[in-house]
């Protein structure tokens, strides 16, 4: 697993033939943020921002996960989604 593989997966996920399910998108989002930013560094969105809260919660669950582990999980998930949805 390398930065190049991660970057490639980040581009490929944008080209899936079908948009993944919400839970799959949250997985992709949270692992991307953990790999690129690290532990969450923002306040939780307000109570009416349901989408923002879901994304924040998913990322927050990865607190303490290393960049390398987040990248590997992200790449593995993109490979799974490519098989499921096509590219």
Curated annotation (Swiss-Prot):
Main localization of the protein described in the UniProt heading: endoplasmic reticulum
The N6-malonyllysine modification is found at 55
N-acetylserine sites (modified residues): 2
UniProt-listed PROSITE patterns: ACB_1, ACB_2
State the GO CC annotations.
endoplasmic reticulum; Golgi apparatus; mitochondrion
Q: How does it assemble?
A: Monomer.
Species annotation: Chaetophractus villosus (South American armadillo)
Q: Which residues cross the membrane?
A: none
| Family per similarity comment | Belongs to the ACBP family.
Under which name does UniProt file this protein? Acyl-CoA-binding protein
Which CDD domains does the entry link to?
A: ACBP
Please give the residue positions where the record annotates the modification N6-acetyllysine.
8, 19, 51, 55, 77
The protein's UniProt keywords, in alphabetical order, are: Acetylation, Endoplasmic reticulum, Golgi apparatus, Hydroxylation, Lipid-binding, Phosphoprotein, Transport
Q: Among the record's GO biological process terms, what is one?
A: fatty acid metabolic process
- Location(s) in or outside the cell: Endoplasmic reticulum; Golgi apparatus
Please explain the role this protein plays, according to its UniProt record.
Binds medium- and long-chain acyl-CoA esters with very high affinity and may function as an intracellular carrier of acyl-CoA esters.
N6-(2-hydroxyisobutyryl)lysine modification sites? 55
What positions does the domain ACB occupy?
2-87
**Would I find Secreted among this entry's keywords?**
no
Q: Which GO terms describe its molecular function?
A: fatty-acyl-CoA binding
Gene from which the chain derives:
DBI
């Amino acid at each position: 697993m390398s930065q190049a593989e991660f970057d490639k997966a980040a581009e490929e996920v944008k080209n899936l033939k079908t948009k993944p399910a919400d839970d799959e998108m949250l997985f992709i989002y949270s692992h991307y943020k953990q790999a690129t930013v690290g532990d969450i560094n923002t306040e939780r969105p307000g109570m009416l921002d349901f989408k923002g809260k879901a994304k924040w919660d998913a990322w927050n669950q990865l607190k303490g996960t290393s960049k390398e582990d987040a990248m590997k999980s992200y790449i593995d998930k993109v490979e799974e989604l490519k098989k499921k949805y096509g590219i």
